[in-house]
């Protein structure tokens, strides 16, 4: 995949888990990687130092803050003079089952989840698209979830936010196609990351793995491969596609 050589790739929430695997994959194929992080400075800097190649950078950002998304895109353009690929990966998951939560906590869960998982990515899309429209090319890939379609009874705001990502992405795919801008979605099921490790222990872990007929969960590297696949120029006609990666644990008709 030499076509990624010297391409400028932004990965939000890129310091760990799926974002880390995506950063490693793009760097391996010669891209210049920019990752943003909210709190994990040490992890982000360690990752940047370990990536093959050069010109990779990381910086702190919280795109739920007003003006932050524009700052992120402007900073990248100022440094590199371009922005070729955007991966909206940053997200959050917080339990808030309606049967057990107080209303004030319910409201906080909804507002924080939607701000992080939907509004933040929408703002990044807006400012990235403005640049990409000016140069008539670019790719935006948003990370969604199986929960957008299957439902999340313990975290309904999470499911709603990811359903919003799907709808937004397909709307933008139509709006931006005349500008030669690709917009796609990768929607993983349960993925084995450091954050998810505690959920994969014992009987709970067995039950999660058994959701898939493959009797396992996904690997971050598998998600990264799907992102790379959508990012190549030969996939332009797949704009608007939502790629499910969940080991057949949930199949849409």
Short names for language-model regions:
Residues 8, 15-17:
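Conserved glycine-rich cofactor-binding loop
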Residues 70, 93-111, 134, 154-157, ...:
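Conserved mid-core segment of classical short-chain dehydrogenase/reductases
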Residues 92, 103-122, 137, 141, ...:
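Catalytic Tyr-X3-Lys loop
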Residues 125, 161, 169:
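Active-site helix of classical SDR
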Residues 130, 174-175, 236:
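Alpha-helical segment proximal to the catalytic Tyr-Lys
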Residues 145:
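Residue(s) in the substrate-gating loop at a strand-loop-helix junction
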Residues 150, 228, 239-253:
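Short C-terminal tail/terminal secondary-structure segment
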Residues 177-182, 238-240:
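Short, small/polar-rich loop/turn modules that mediate ligand/substrate recognition or access, typified
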